[in-house]
Amino acid sequence: MEIKILNKTDTEIQVEIKGESHTMMNALKSCLLEDKAVKVATYDIEFPGISDPVLYVRTDKSEDPIDAIKVAAKKLADECDDFLKIFGKKAKA
């Protein structure tokens, strides 16, 4: 995975995330939208199968968009860890 910041202001960011698909982007977008400071979170894959996704996030002035992405990514990682633990226990049963 490579990450390239395309545009950044105090309240907006566009980030290209190379090598990712709708699976990761939808999950990240969902976590971002749970943050009250995030006003818009969306992504676009201009040409599926060819283009890399570009994430767009806009926040209110209370949170930097980079911090919002970091918080959402941590939350997503924690949710995956929880799933793995629960699934591991059930799979042994």
From Swiss-Prot:
GO terms for cellular component: cytoplasm; DNA-directed RNA polymerase complex. The keyword Transferase applies. Keywords: Cytoplasm, DNA-directed RNA polymerase, Nucleotidyltransferase, Transcription, Transferase. The keyword Cytoplasm applies. InterPro entries: RBP11-like (IPR036603), RBP11-like_dimer (IPR009025), Rpo11-like (IPR022905). It catalyses: RNA(n) + a ribonucleoside 5'-triphosphate = RNA(n+1) + diphosphate. SUPFAM superfamilies: RBP11-like subunits of RNA polymerase. Its main location: cytoplasm. GO terms for biological process: DNA-templated transcription. One of its GO terms (molecular function) is protein dimerization activity. Its EC number is 2.7.7.6. CDD domains: RNAP_L. Signal peptide: none annotated. It is found in: Cytoplasm. Part of the RNA polymerase complex. Belongs to the archaeal Rpo11/eukaryotic RPB11/RPC19 RNA polymerase subunit family. PANTHER family: DNA-DIRECTED RNA POLYMERASE I,II,III, DNA-DIRECTED RNA POLYMERASES I AND III SUBUNIT RPAC2. DNA-dependent RNA polymerase (RNAP) catalyzes the transcription of DNA into RNA using the four ribonucleoside triphosphates as substrates. This is DNA-directed RNA polymerase subunit Rpo11. It comes from Methanocella arvoryzae (strain DSM 22066 / NBRC 105507 / MRE50).
